[in-house]
């Protein structure tokens, strides 16, 4: 929503950010016994950092070229970075869900569903807050007319990077 709908940038690489968020979150919960909520925050940071890194060279691209670059990123992440032949840091077994905050058990499907809905609502409220902020208005202005936004002293490069980063962070949480 942030990158395609608000910024008007076509990205086919969201699955790469989802995969990075999933791998980082799985590593945190399975091997380091990090709480699931904290691992979601770490996954969001990992997805945001990856999106920032992908966004840097893609700043000058638009349309089909941007879509191709982001698709190549997604394919390289899923085929190379997350391949256990090359990297052994990704857990390969089922991950046991630790209790939330050490108290709330989410092992049953119903409780995990409720937890997922709560996370969805939190992400929705956060993204909605960004949408109604100065940053959200700048992203929308960039989508409508990049030159007009630049004439109103909106830093186009930083706004594009912000849109990429927010989009990657949300995708990281989805992982």
PLM regions with names:
Residues 1-175:
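Transmembrane alpha-helices and adjacent helix-loop boundaries
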């Amino acid at each position: 929503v942030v990158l395609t709908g608000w910024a008007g940038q076509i990205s086919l690489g969201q699955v790469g950010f989802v995969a990075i968020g999933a791998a980082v979150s799985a590593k945190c919960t399975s091997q380091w016994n990090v709480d699931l909520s904290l691992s979601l925050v770490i996954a969001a940071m990992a997805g945001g950092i990856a999106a920032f890194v992908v966004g840097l060279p893609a700043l000058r691209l638009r349309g089909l070229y941007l879509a191709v670059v982001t698709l190549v990123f997604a394919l390289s992440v899923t085929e190379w970075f997350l391949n256990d032949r090359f990297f052994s840091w990704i857990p390969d077994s089922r991950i046991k869900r630790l209790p939330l905050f050490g108290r709330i058990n989410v092992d049953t499907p119903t409780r995990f569903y409720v937890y997922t809905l709560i996370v969805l609502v939190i992400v929705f409220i956060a993204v909605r807050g960004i949408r109604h902020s100065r940053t959200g208005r700048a992203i929308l202005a960039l989508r409508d007319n990049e030159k007009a936004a630049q004439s109103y002293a909106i830093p186009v490069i930083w706004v594009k990077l912000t849109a990429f980063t927010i989009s990657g962070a949300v995708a990281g949480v989805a992982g």
